[in-house]
Amino acid sequence: MDSKFKGEYSGTKSVSERHLIDQVNLQTYLNENLESFEEISSIEEFIGGQSNPTYLIKTPSKSYVLRRKPPGKLLKSAHAVDREYKVIAALNKTDVPVPKAYLHCEDESIIGTEFFLMSCVEGEVMWEPHIPKATNEERKKIYQSMNETIAKLHSVDHEKIG
């Protein structure tokens, strides 16, 4: 699909003051924990979302997505980025289309909060369920793809994959 589906909550922006990341610490950590990780060329914050700050991390040849707990005092059970990472990493063992989970970091000294890193998957966020800018044929293809993905997800043996 082309960009006609992008809305006001799509894309990236400069990282907000509240969500700044220590790029030097992050670079050092990723160099030590990911084989052949390149120099970070940019970090941007995704627009939209409700809970965990999410960033687009670019290197010269690859893009990644970093999700972290927000800064500040949090409820112990809230913002479970460890659970998000475990689910995505487990689904990497299936045919459910999810990003590649690279690593999970509990060490808050790296960027101030726990985080995980995954591949960046290009696509469109469909904020309106009826997809008003889509033609009937486009809408049909989108719904069919969504239904196929949900069916794959429901067929996963969660005990087998962890």
Model-derived features with residue positions:
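Juxta-kinase regulatory segment immediately upstream of eukaryotic protein kinase catalytic domains
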Residues: 2-39
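ATP-binding pocket architecture of kinase catalytic cores
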Residues: 40-162
